Structure formats: structure tokens, C-alpha cells
Amino acid sequence: VLPFSAALEVLGYWVLGRIFCDIWAAVDVLCCTASILSLCAISIDRYIGVRYSLQYPTLVTRRKAILALLGVWVLSTVISIGPLLGWKEPAPNDDKECGVTEEPFYALFSSLGSFYIPLAVILVMYCRVYIVAKRTTKNLEAGVMKEMSNSKELTLRIHSKNFHEDTLSSTKAKGHNPRSSIAVKLFKFSREKKAAKTLGIVVGMFILCWLPFFIALPLGSLFSTLKPPDAVFKVVFWLGYFNSCLNPIIYPCSSKEFKRAFVRILGCQCRGRRRRRRRRRLGGCAYTYRPWTRGGSLERSQSRKDSLDDSGSCLSGSQRTLPSASPSPGYLGRAAPPPVELCAVPEWKAPGALLSLPAPQPPGRRGRRDSGPLFTFRLLAERGSPAAGDGACRPAPDAANGQPGFKTNMPLAPGQF
């Protein structure tokens, strides 16, 4: 729509014929109405998010969101299709003239359906959001939490609307923690409140940009004496277009989530891809460890899907503590040995005696080869002395005898190595 409107303003006349002029005018009303109704739907969504923050995922489902989007476009089509069906003023004799339909009753109908009714819904929803946010903030700030150490009871007191006290008590045996519950509620409410503030800015700019046009259009159509000059009408007409340029600026500046979404949509991820490739080159090798197999050993993993660089369980250039592997029943009751330090070097192979010793089998399972649990992890190569400037990875010397050793934080069962 916008390129054709710009061509009309620059050239001063319409060059695409009468039929395309009618289509352009209808599509212009369709897109503007869909934009305004979308803000109306978002305001309802924000009210639900603030009023029912904990129940929001169950109230607003994917299916309901799709139905809301379909409703927005169906209503927009109903409002905009009138001129294509003949509900318009007589066409001028000159095909080089083209503009929005100024038929009085259609102008009134489209103004009510496209702007004034959605605006009333938006204002009502935001008044409700403000009331709920103010009341909820006051109640959460006035809430008093106590912990009785002797009886191990947790008491949460929240002053509600009629200033009565609701006491919620639970014991540790039940595993319910009111403090964690109120923390979740505070987090969700603050997030929804911030989103509502962002949308409030958007709605404010929407009113400032569209209100002059929807005042000038119906008044100029119904009363010829109140029709504004062409220059004024063009200014208010393009002011409505300008609102669509503001929204992509307001959303990222007010919300990190929207900013990340815009960056992802625009495809500005080249820098992130380069960083990930650099981490893969410098981060060592991916290995697979099968702890309870007969002859359990460390194997070089060939699948990128098993690499912890993609799953976020390993950071390049630093060490991450790996979770301890649970021992088999055959090892229960034995004292856990100190962690063995391992280091994997791409060009250096560890002696086979260290990596291929058979692991003891749990009772009743001898003679069987059970794959057991699979642990995939990344052993980051340690650099040697500072003088080694070639970037090669060398084994770290063992603290006891100066021999090359390995380094990891995962404790191994006795007799595994």
C-alpha cells in the first residue's frame, strides 16, 4: 500500500487505472483496520496476563490465539470490502484521480469499525489493567511472610481488598513453599506489568497518529463545510502511516524479548554464528563415555548433536562442572574416590591401559554386554606453558610424578581406571 501512496504523492496523479485504484483503496482500509484491531486484541491479551498471570498459559492457548488472528482479519475484510461491492461515491471522469472513499455513510461505518470501537475497547482494557496492577502491587507490597522455626510452618499474610487476612500454612513434609509461590507470582506479574507499559506507549502513539485522520474523514464526508484543505488532509493521512513506522522502534526499545525477536527475524545472526564456529575450533574434542559397559572406555563422538557446545553444557575456554554419574548397585556402600583429573588432547592419545580396563559388573549381570547410560561430554584441552605460542594443546603434568594426566570434574568409580 505505502509504495503506491508514495507514488501518488510524488507524481501528483494516479497512473495505474481506475480498477487498481479501487483495489488500492480497499487494501489500504484492510491493512489499517487489521493493524488497529491487532492492538485491540493485544490489549485484551495484556489484561488477561496481568489479571490472571499464573493461569495465563492455560487461558491463552495456541488455538485461541489463531482464532483471534482469524477474527481480526475477517472483521477487517468485512469493513474494507464495501467499496469493491459498490458502496462508494461516484468515480470521477478522470482516471488519474484516486483517493480514499468519502461516501458519507461508508466513511462513518469504517471510522466506527476501524477506529472508534477498537479504541473504546483498548481504553477500557487499559483502565482495567491499571486498576488491577495498582491493586495487585499494593497487596504484594503489604503482604507479610513469616517462618516459624519451631513448628516449621510457613505463614503468608496478604491484605486483600476487604483487608481480611488469608493464612496459608504448610509443613516441610508436604513439600510446599509459599515463599517460592509468591516469588513466582511476583516474577510473572512484574513481567506482565512491563509488557503492559510497553503496549501503553504503543497505544498512546497510535491515538496521536490516527485520531486526526478519523476526525477529519467522517466530518469532511458528512459536512462539506468542515472538510479540511487538501494539504491538511494529506498530512493527517500520512500521519497514520507514520504510526506503523513507530511500532518497530517502540517495541525493541522497551522490551528485550521484542529486540531479540526483531534481530532474529531480520537475520542479523552472522556475528553469533562466527563466535560459535570459533568456539568449536578452539574448544577441544567431544567424547562419549559408557561407564558401565564391559571394557568401558572413552570414545570420540562423531555426531555434532552430541556435542555439548550445541546443548550449552560446556563453555569454550572455561570449565563447567559435570554432574556426577550414579554408581551401579555393585558400587553402593563403597567410599567415593577423589576426582581423577583428565585432559584430552587432539594430537595425543592416552595409553590404552588407562582407557580399556574392564569395569566390574553388577551382581547377576555377568556375561552380558549392557550398553548402560550414555554420558557425552567435552574435555577441554589445557594449554601448555605460556611460551607455547602455536596454540597446540598439551597434556597437563600430573601433580605426583610429572607424567601427562587427564583432567575432569566427574568422579569415577573405584577400579574403573
Curated annotation (Swiss-Prot):
Disulfide bonds: C21-C98
Membrane topology: Multi-pass membrane protein
GO biological process assignments: adenylate cyclase-activating adrenergic receptor signaling pathway; cell-cell signaling; phospholipase C-activating G protein-coupled receptor signaling pathway; positive regulation of cytosolic calcium ion concentration; positive regulation of MAPK cascade; regulation of cardiac muscle contraction; regulation of vasoconstriction
One cellular component (GO) term of this entry: nuclear membrane
Membrane-spanning segments: 1-8, 21-44, 65-87, 105-127, 199-222, 230-254
PROSITE patterns (UniProt xref): G_PROTEIN_RECEP_F1_1, G_PROTEIN_RECEP_F1_2
Residue ranges annotated as Extracellular topological domain: 9-20, 88-104, 223-229
Modified residues (Phosphothreonine): T167
Record localization: Nucleus membrane; Cell membrane; Cytoplasm; Membrane, Caveola
Keyword Repeat belongs to the record: no
Keyword Disulfide bond: yes
Span of the annotated motif Nuclear localization signal: 371-381
Cytoplasmic side stretches: 45-64, 128-198, 255-417
Keywords, in A-Z order: Cell membrane, Cytoplasm, Disulfide bond, G-protein coupled receptor, Lipoprotein, Membrane, Nucleus, Palmitate, Phosphoprotein, Receptor, Transducer, Transmembrane, Transmembrane helix
A Pfam family this chain is assigned to: 7tm_1
Single GO term (MF): protein heterodimerization activity
Lipidation (S-palmitoyl cysteine): C268
Region feature (Disordered): 295-331, 385-417
Function noted in UniProt: This alpha-adrenergic receptor mediates its action by association with G proteins that activate a phosphatidylinositol-calcium second messenger system. Its effect is mediated by G(q) and G(11) proteins. Nuclear ADRA1A-ADRA1B heterooligomers regulate phenylephrine (PE)-stimulated ERK signaling in cardiac myocytes.
Family the entry assigns: Belongs to the G-protein coupled receptor 1 family. Adrenergic receptor subfamily. ADRA1B sub-subfamily.
Assembly and interaction partners: Homo- and heterooligomer. Heterooligomerizes with ADRA1B homooligomers in cardiac myocytes. Interacts with CAVIN4.
Protein name: Alpha-1B adrenergic receptor
UniProt organism field: Canis lupus familiaris (Dog)
